[in-house]
């Protein structure tokens, strides 16, 4: 029997040292029979004689130029006159797919001003204006038309003295309401109008987007998935370590560990960035590496799964000039690094030369120990941070956008003898229908089993609501 632990990390953006930080908090947490996957693409590319930004840039030689040596311009592949920038990435299920449980969209860029130029050895602004970057356009395979998306600001360096030359920003939007009811999830996703600095700026301009998708998979084992986001600069003076807990590796047999992530400003020919794993139970540390990603040049402008470059994108540049997206298995032969019964895992992000910003990281654990598997069985548990409702464990019997569907489910539960109530979450723009709120998880589980036995509701589940200031 094999087990799987997956750690997801989205990281990004060139920056000066000792930058301002945004504390990392849980964005999403769930127990689910399913998987997590990330897709994305860069949104600016080089423009040079004989090549437009829409043409893939494939130079991965030791002499390949860095993004601060190019005239960087917007990619725009959608043939839509209403967009100034757009790129696509393809999503497909790993194994048998199912309903999307969560989808989160991130976009980020270096953006001190609209455009700049290199004169001699000095970067000069050409257009000092800086447009609003909080909204983008988003197209899914199901809708095939752009939907405007407004984001939640995670970080903006425009007013930070240490960061203003690059002025990186990061935005996030929960797009679950667009993917969860979709009849077509597999296909190309397009993000348009991500703002970034054009031309040449200090350190080079980079920009991209990433879509995190958590989906149900009936053939999967129960997994715990947690995502965190925030902002922290990684420099030669400032490293970052995340201690993941709340899991326990199997008591016996082999299991696998995997990480995924996204970065900005990981230049191909600038060495010194490294990601390593430390396991307290074994006392061992190992650096991550693959044929695509050397241990001491981990962020190198590529999009990969293990040893293979991913090309299901438009454009499908082999050198993405400062944008990285990766998925890698962790070598753990004979449980040398991560032993059985391990309960914590540290991810270490370091840099010896250049700098980047970390803004999201996540953990997925598949095939939990017997006691956890038995406890949660097929019951989905989703954690939500909210200030507008009482914290506790809510037994959910339906989630809908349409008020007619809400009323129908409430009436349906009434016919079964339950007084269903509705909690409207403004952040997700969703109506959660629940039949009880409990202080203890065990009491909520009992109610779930009762609903299963006494109604025809297909999948009651638990919403774990926490209140954070």
Locate the predicted segments by residue.
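Disulfide-rich extracellular domains of secreted proteins
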Residues: 20-375
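Boundary/activation segment at the start of structured domains
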Residues: 28, 393-394
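Local beta-strand/beta-hairpin segments that build beta-sheet-rich folds
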Residues: 288, 397-398, 435
């Amino acid at each position: 029997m094999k087990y799987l632990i997956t750690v997801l990390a989205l990281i990004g953006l060139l920056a000066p040292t000792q930058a301002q930080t945004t504390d990392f908090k849980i964005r999403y947490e769930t127990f689910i029979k399913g998987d997590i996957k990330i897709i994305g693409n860069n949104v600016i590319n080089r423009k040079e004689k004989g090549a437009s930004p829409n043409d893939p840039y494939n130079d991965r030689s030791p002499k390949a130029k860095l993004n601060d040596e190019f005239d960087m311009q917007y990619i725009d592949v959608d043939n839509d006159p209403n967009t100034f920038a757009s790129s696509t990435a393809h999503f497909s299920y790993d194994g048998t797919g199912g309903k999307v449980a969560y989808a989160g969209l991130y976009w980020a860029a270096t953006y001190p001003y609209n455009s700049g130029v290199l004169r001699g050895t000095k970067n000069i602004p050409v257009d000092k204006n800086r447009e609003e970057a909080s909204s983008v356009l988003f197209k899914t395979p199901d809708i095939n038309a752009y939907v405007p998306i407004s984001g939640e600001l995670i970080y903006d360096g425009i007013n930070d003295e240490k960061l203003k030359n690059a002025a990186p920003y990061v935005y996030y939007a929960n797009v679950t309401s667009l993917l969860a009811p979709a009849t077509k999830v597999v296909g190309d996703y397009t993000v348009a109008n991500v703002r970034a600095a054009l031309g040449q700026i200090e350190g080079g301009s980079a920009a991209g987007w990433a879509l995190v998708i958590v989906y149900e998979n009936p053939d999967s084992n129960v997994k715990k998935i947690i995502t965190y986001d925030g902002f922290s600069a990684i420099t030669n003076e400032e490293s970052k370590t995340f201690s993941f807990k709340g899991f326990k590796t199997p008591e016996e047999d082999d299991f696998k560990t995997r990480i995924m992530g996204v970065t900005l400003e990981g230049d191909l020919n600038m060495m010194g960035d490294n990601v390593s794993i430390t396991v307290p139970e074994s006392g061992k540390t190992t650096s991550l590496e693959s044929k695509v990603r050397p241990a001491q040049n981990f962020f190198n402008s590529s999009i990969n799964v293990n040893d293979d470059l991913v090309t299901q994108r438009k454009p499908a540049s082999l050198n993405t000039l400062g944008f990285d997206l990766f998925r890698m298995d962790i070598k753990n032969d004979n449980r040398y690094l991560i032993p059985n019964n391990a309960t914590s895992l540290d991810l270490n992000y370091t840099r010896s030369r250049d700098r980047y910003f970390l803004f999201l990281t996540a953990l997925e654990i598949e095939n939990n120990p017997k006691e956890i598997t038995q406890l949660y069985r097929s019951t989905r548990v989703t954690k939500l941070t909210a200030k507008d409702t009482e914290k506790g464990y809510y037994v959910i019997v339906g989630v809908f956008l349409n008020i007619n569907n809400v009323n129908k489910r409430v009436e349906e539960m009434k016919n079964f003898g339950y007084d269903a109530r509705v909690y409207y979450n403004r952040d997700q723009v969703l109506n959660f229908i629940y039949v009880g709120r409990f202080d203890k998880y065990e009491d909520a589980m009992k109610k779930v089993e009762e609903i299963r036995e006494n109604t025809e509701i297909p999948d009651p589940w638990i919403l774990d609501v926490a209140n954070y200031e």
